[in-house]
């Protein structure tokens, strides 16, 4: 699934600041930084609801950084979002993490910012990555806890559901695997 970067409000702001760093890095590294900043997006974001395992939290941040997502959100009602630094490998320095103390607060903040709420679940018939319409406006992909998936509160508040079609015996995928398969690319 390809997606054009249509909502990077920060390109000029970041561009001016990265230009001031040019004299301190090689031209090649400066080009990587310039290209990376130009591709950052806030058109899509991720909400991780009560992610228990530090390795999954770190892998989620790495996925967000790799796919150009500038900001992700976390709900921390059951546990703190605490990425394992050995797995994050510094990518947490490039992604803004917004922490919320409740699911209701997170969903309200995302709606206030103009996002539609897209819950990931294997149990609902709605859209697949191939049929998901990224052009309908900014969206937040919601991933649930490793233990129970998304909460009833997310199910009740979602605008649509995104599922990965599966035909094996397993009922669900690891949150990070699901992230990898559902995030559109710029």
Describe the residue ranges of each PLM region.
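Residues that form or flank phosphate/diphosphate-binding pockets in enzymes
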Residues: 55-56, 127, 149, 173
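Active-site/ligand-binding-proximal alpha/beta "capping" segment
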Residues: 123-166
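Short glycine/threonine-rich catalytic loop with a Thr-x-Gly-x-Asp
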Residues: 167-177
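A residue-level signal for conserved active-site and pocket-lining positions in enzyme catalytic cores
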Residues: 117, 142, 178
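Conserved small/polar residues in nucleotide/adenosyl-binding loops
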Residues: 179-185
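Aromatic/hydrophobic pocket-lining residues that form π-stacking "cages" and hydrophobic walls in ligand
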Residues: 60, 154, 179
């Amino acid at each position: 699934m390809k997606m054009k970067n249509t909502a990077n409000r920060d390109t000029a702001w970041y561009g001016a600041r990265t230009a001031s760093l040019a004299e301190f890095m090689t031209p090649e590294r400066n080009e990587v930084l310039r290209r990376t900043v130009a591709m950052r997006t806030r058109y899509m974001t991720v909400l991780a609801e009560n992610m228990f395992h530090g390795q999954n939290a770190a892998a989620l941040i790495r996925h967000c950084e790799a796919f150009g997502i500038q900001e992700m959100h976390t709900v921390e009602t059951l546990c703190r979002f605490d990425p394992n630094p050995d797995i994050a490998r510094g990518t947490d320095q490039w992604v803004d993490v917004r922490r919320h103390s409740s699911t209701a607060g997170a969903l309200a903040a995302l709606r206030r910012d103009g996002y539609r709420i897209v819950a990931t679940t294997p149990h609902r018939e709605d859209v697949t990555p191939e049929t998901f319409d990224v052009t309908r406006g900014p969206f937040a992909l919601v991933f649930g806890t490793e233990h129970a998936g998304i909460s009833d509160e997310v199910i009740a508040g979602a605008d649509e559901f995104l599922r990965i079609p599966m035909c094996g015996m397993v009922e669900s995928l690891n949150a990070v695997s699901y992230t990898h398969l559902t995030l559109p690319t710029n």
